[in-house]
Amino acid sequence: MAKLTKKQKEAQSKIENGKTYTVAEASALIKEVSNANFDASVDLAVRLNVDPRKANQMVRGVVTLPHGTGKDVKVLALVTPDKEEEAKEAGADYVGLDEYLDKIKGGWTDVDVIITMPSVMGKLGPLGRVLGPRGLMPNPKTGTVTMDIAKAVSDVKAGKIDFKVDKHGIVHAGVGKASFDAEKIAGNARELLTTLVKLKPQAAKGVYIKTIYMSSTMSPSVQIDTKRFTEQ
């Protein structure tokens, strides 16, 4: 195991072993222990008591973080010519269709989100092997396949994120940056956790949220009390 640096030891010493924190406490603590020399992302890892191999226990959804992600989200709008102006005015970084489909075929994926229209989805099918593994395939369930292109682009730019439980039953999602006020990190985290509770599958038995950890890039993680995460 790699030896901890002095900074890492200092950070670790601020977190009490075996203690669980409220969201507000964890958010303040993460700001204290985040020692990266860049504006680190703050992430939540939520372990759910579900079996994602079963279709009736899959958890996926979208949430608009009230304080945004802190990230400049690059959006590609794959639209027909009549929708191009709408996409540009809403703030899409790249707008077009066939030229971008060709670029993606060639391996280009330098975007965070792709938004498209139902009539274009047929053209995206063959690109699934490029887009799927990167989480870029548009999906009606996450609002990225729609006729209201302007709203979809605006929502993503304002802090709308989508999430999905992984094969281990964990949802990973960013809830801001270390430069955010602790209150903003906490507000975003609560919004995500509340959304996860609403999405509890009927087939999920027993305790739904098993553990919640908050961390920032290169920082130790802080455990959040699963019974107190709605506290202000």
UniProtKB/Swiss-Prot annotation:
Disulfide bonds: none
Keywords, comma-separated and alphabetical: Repressor, Ribonucleoprotein, Ribosomal protein, RNA-binding, rRNA-binding, Translation regulation, tRNA-binding
Gene Ontology CC: one annotated term: large ribosomal subunit
GO annotation terms (biological process): regulation of translation; translation
Annotated GO MF terms: rRNA binding; structural constituent of ribosome; tRNA binding
Pfam families per UniProt: Ribosomal_L1 (PF00687)
InterPro entries tied to this protein: Ribosom_uL1_bac-type, Ribosomal_uL1, Ribosomal_uL1-like, Ribosomal_uL1/biogenesis, Ribosomal_uL1_3-a/b-sand, Ribosomal_uL1_CS
Primary role: Binds directly to 23S rRNA. The L1 stalk is quite mobile in the ribosome, and is involved in E site tRNA release.
Assigned protein family: Belongs to the universal ribosomal protein uL1 family.
Quaternary organization: Part of the 50S ribosomal subunit.
Protein name stated in the entry: Large ribosomal subunit protein uL1
Origin organism lineage: Bacteria, Pseudomonadati, Bacteroidota, Flavobacteriia, Flavobacteriales
Gene of this entry: rplA
